[in-house]
Structures are given as structure tokens and as C-alpha cells.
Amino acid sequence: IKRDYYLQQLISSKSNNLIKIVTGIRRSGKSFLLFNLFHNHLIETGISEDHIIEIALDDRLNKNLRDPDVILQHIHERIVDDKLYYIILDEVQMIDEFTDVLNSLLHIRNADVYVTGSNSKFLSKDVVTEFRGRGDEIHLFPLSFAELYNSIGGDKFELWKSYYTYGGLPGILELDSEKKKAAYLRSLHETVYLKDIIERNNLKNSEEFMELMRVMASCIGSSCNPSKLENTFKSVKSETLDRKTISKYLSYMEDAFLIEKSMRYDIKGRKYIGTLSKYYFQDIGLRNALLNFRQVEENHIMENVIYNELRLRGFCVDVGMVEARTAKERKQLEVDFVANMADRRYYIQSAFAMPDDDKREQECASLKKIDDSFKKIIIMRDDIKPYHDNNGFYIVGLMDFLLKPDLMEQL
């Protein structure tokens, strides 16, 4: 599968004197991006194999190279002339004192360094902080629907059914039955993600943690916080899990790129509201596997997929809140997504269907209360031709939104 969006980011950042840090959930294709796609690009542009130093640190055979002094000596021994060397380190967080190693590599005048990592606690936070102005992060998401469709083709609605059930981890494409796909996703939780989180955080109660993950999977698109989740455990699960532990567990999930938090934003007051947030899964197949594929609700999943699509396009995405006042009451209306990038902003509603005027009014109510000039978009599941409604809002179909990345600019 071509991953041109990310490959172009790597190509444009060549020789920029920064460490290129490719982050993303385990099994999302980081190694393939660097060791295959980027490697092939280097060869095609005339770089010789002996000037590409590649080390997969999660390979047992390279266990000795997780020692900082050993790996630095290994790299220095392979640099034998003044030509430029491309150094590619996969799962760099497995090196002891890896920030010191990266600092040392920055001092090699004829080296261009690329690393991958699958834990943001060690990477996005530590590395980007440690290498202020010297680190260039590229976040790799699982396959988008467009990447999948452009590679596989076929009936887009049949592919959509598969996508909203099994998600976009590249390993899914190698499996030829629904049973195998479901088993693969379930096993990833046990053998990869949970194992990583237990090891990195010295987690004692893995079942308690998995139970919280299942709760998060069942409430995508719902506003929550540790206090609300604590009450859920008491009332629904008849279990005690205090908010401090819940907050810690949520940070573990975010650090492993399993989930992302979208904060609530007061549109008119132009400030964040710190009480409740929404959480979305970076891969919808992993979310469904947590629930044994029992709650595959297309409307909620569609909202999650739209969130992921906006994020991979580079937007910061918040949940918008706007106040509606009448003579009798004041109530908060929600805008599903406030998507920001530089001076661009879009207000977006995910509307699975608008079968009647009441539903249409419900979806439009919050957008009507926003009095600025940024574009307001309602995305429907139906395959419709994009149009403006009487309010000046843009109504687009889900397929157009997912398959035409320039559509929002063109509306």
C-alpha cells in the first residue's frame, strides 16, 4: 500500500538537520514506511545500500544494540567516509538512555537521522521537549479509508462496512476471512498493546485496566471524565475504580496512541472548558475487538472515523460548545468538531442521517448559534451530491469527505 502522504513528509524533511521522529500505534506501518517505502526512495535517488544504516531495535537479534554505548560504536564503525549516511532506528525507545544516543547522533556531521517509536510518553513528550527545535515529528495513523480504497478499489460501500468493523491496521489486509481478522485484532490487545503497557508502567492489575478500556470503547463520542467514569464503575460494573487510577490508566492509553482526547471548547467565550472531554480510538477495529464486535454502531463509529480523518489531515480537533438561551432556559449545544489549522477553522457535525425536519433542525441548531464566518459543514452517511442548505451550511456525503481531501477547501 502506498503511504504517499507520509512518504512525502519524510522526503521533504531530508537533510534538515533535525531528527525525524515517526510516531504511531504499534502495527500501524512505521517500519514499513521507513524500511520499505523510504528505503526504496533513497535507492531510487542514487543512495547506495552501505550508506543506509537500518536497525530494528525490537528484533531479538539486536538486543545488544539496546545498550547506548554499543549502538553508538556500531553506527560509528559503519560510517567510513564523508558522504551522507541515512540512519534509521526502529522502536528507538527500547535503547537505554535513548535521548543521549540521539543527541550523540546529532553531532555526526554527515548523518541524517530517522527514528520510530510507539509510545508518546517516551517520544512526543520527552524527545520533542529534549530536542526543542531539533526534532521533527511525523505521526503515522493506521490506514485511512482513502488509502485503503485507493489501494484496493471495488465497491466503496462494501469496503466501508469492512473498514468500520475491522479498521485500518495494515496486517488486516493479509487476512482472508472475517474470523481471522477478528482473532488478529483480539490477539493484538493481549500480545502487543497490553503487554507493552504492563511493561512500561509496571501495571499490576491488568484486568482492571482492560475493563476501563472496554468502557472507553463503549462510549466513543460521549463526554466523560475520570469522575464520571468512577461513577460508571460503581453503578454499572459494581466495581470500585477511583478517579486517580482512572486518570492514570487513561494517560497510559493515550501514551500508547490507542486513544486521543478531544477537549471541550466554548466557541463564543473562546476558551477551553475543563470539565468533560471526548475520547476517540485511533483504530476502530481495535475498539470493536475490545467489545468482541458486539457494539458495531455505525453512527458512533462514523463520528470516530471523521475525527481521525481530520487529525491525520493535520487539524487540531476540539468539541465545540455554544450556549442557547430562551426565556425559560439556557442550554449548551454541541458542535461535534471544531477543526483548526493555522488561520483555517471548520465547524463540523457528523449526522448519520437527517430523515425529517426535526432531525435536521437538531443537527443545525448549534451551528446556527455561531456568528462567525468560518465554514459550517454537516457530513451525512448518505451518498449525496454536496450542496448548500438555506442556512448556508455545506451538506456533504461521508464518501466525498473521506475520499476527497481537498473538498473542504473547495466548498
Annotate each PLM feature.
Residues 1, 32, 39, 43, ...:
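A cross-kingdom feature that marks ATP-driven nucleic-acid transaction machinery
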Residues 1-15:
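Pre-Walker A adenine-sensing motif
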Residues 22:
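Hydrophobic anchor at the beta1->P-loop junction of P-loop NTPases
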Residues 25:
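P-loop (Walker A) phosphate-binding loop of NTP-binding proteins
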Residues 53-82:
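Short glycine-rich substrate-engagement loop in P-loop NTPases that contacts/grips substrate
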Residues 112-118, 139:
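Structural recognition of the conserved hydrophobic beta-strand(s) that form the central parallel beta-sheet
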Residues 121-137, 151-153:
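Short regulatory helix/loop adjacent to the ATP-binding pocket of P-loop NTPases
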Residues 145-323:
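Interdomain hinge/linker elements that couple catalytic modules in large macromolecular machines
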